[in-house]
């Protein structure tokens, strides 16, 4: 069970989900990345789920796969695709009819692929996608198996027994190790919030040592839809948490920070100090957020095209009638997109996304600021 790929390895120096690659290659932001929501099913109900309100007990009928592939064919500079849910691997019918064809199309075109999964299903299910998969992305916010059993099923009315939930946890770790051995990059993402902060060192060790993940992603948690009740960190707490992570991390494992609310244009010297440390650290990257810059999300059931799968901005079109490039151009012309459209080339920064701006910088006009470092 091995992956056969001759494509360039994904490394801190080459991250196909980094929106700044468009600026490097084409001089400006482009539509190079599409995310598909392929299911509303999930066998967990995490308290931090960004799309929890959209989960259902049964999937609606999906649009034809030929239409989805046709819309991808219309994107000349497509570089990466992602598949998300729900749990995209839960329905074998969906895996065979949508997940595999999308990944296979992309792989054969040289487009890099990612799927978001909780990795709790039997390993045989993942064998369907290994030949076409570059990155398996998993959320990992558990200090202990007890945390997993509690947090991972917090929003479920009828929970499996504790023993069943603990077995899910063990299977997740086993599956991660198996996929890494098969040549897939397993990237575990941890949300920084009041719940994970006390356990952050243990979580990092579990990801790098027990699960053998090649990458640990760290994202601050922003209140979005389903997870709006969870307590976010203050900017000061977040800076302290990131410094602590940099102190204790395994330097041989790639650590990727995403949607950080700290920018080189900040007048705050503590922000500047943290950014200098991040830039100098070995195997550390800070990713520009792809949502609304290089990426659009497509719902395969209703066909809606949106900026992100957990946002509340209205649809930009529908794949039944609109091409993805036309929806992208429509987004670029919106007032919101223009407010977020800033670029400091000397630090390769594309500014904040919608969630960051709404959470911390509602009154800041980033287009009038410039990098100070």
UniProtKB/Swiss-Prot annotation:
Positions of the Radical SAM core domain: 26-256
Keyword Iron-sulfur (UniProt): yes
Gene Ontology molecular function, alphabetical: 4 iron, 4 sulfur cluster binding; catalytic activity; metal ion binding
Top-rank taxon: Bacteria
Reported cofactor(s): [4Fe-4S] cluster
InterPro entries: Aldolase_TIM, rSAM, rSAM_YfkAB, YfkB
Cofactor note: Binds 1 [4Fe-4S] cluster. The cluster is coordinated with 3 cysteines and an exchangeable S-adenosyl-L-methionine.
Keywords: 4Fe-4S, Iron, Iron-sulfur, Metal-binding, S-adenosyl-L-methionine
Family: Belongs to the radical SAM superfamily.
Protein name: Putative protein YfkA
Natural source organism: Bacillus subtilis (strain 168)
Record gene name: yfkA
